[in-house]
């Protein structure tokens, strides 16, 4: 952004603040939880709630895996750690394919909580500089939701 004129920067920021993009982190959260619940329905070893708790890490492996280990045990905590690391690796390695086949917002959604830090350079490279602000906003909102969703989903018992 520093190479752009002041007017170009203002236009870039204004265009990035599309009100519809505010819903991207919400849709990422809902889509991830729905996908995990559906996957959990087909697993005999794990409940849909366990799968949703793992998915609610959204790539924030250093925090979610610790919470899940404390609430549900080391086995599910390890699954959460590996699942979140894989989410980040997929976002990093598949960003060009995600943009090509699903659009410029796809790597942001796939990146989950990592979109404001580790996956931001890759997202910027393949989605474009105009997606930096929405990527940071997305990462912040999703990142902020992790401790609340993980602890909530781990504390529910049927």
Where are the predicted features?
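Alpha-helical transmembrane segments of polytopic integral membrane proteins
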Residues: 6-7, 31-36, 64, 95, ...
């Amino acid at each position: 952004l520093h190479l752009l004129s002041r007017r170009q920067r203002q236009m870039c920021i204004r265009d990035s603040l599309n009100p519809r993009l505010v819903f991207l982190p919400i849709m990422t959260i809902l889509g991830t939880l729905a996908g995990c619940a559906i996957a959990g329905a087909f697993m005999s070893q794990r409940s849909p709630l366990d799968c949703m708790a793992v998915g609610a890490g959204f790539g924030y492996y250093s925090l979610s895996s610790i919470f899940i280990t404390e609430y549900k045990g080391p086995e599910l905590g390890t699954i959460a750690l590996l699942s979140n690391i894989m989410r980040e690796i997929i976002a990093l390695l598949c960003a060009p394919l995600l943009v090509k086949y699903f659009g410029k917002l796809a790597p942001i959604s796939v990146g989950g909580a990592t979109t404001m830090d580790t996956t931001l350079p890759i997202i910027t490279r393949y989605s474009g500089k105009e997606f930096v602000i929405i990527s940071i906003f997305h990462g912040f909102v999703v990142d902020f939701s992790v401790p609340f969703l993980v602890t909530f989903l781990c504390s529910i018992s049927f």
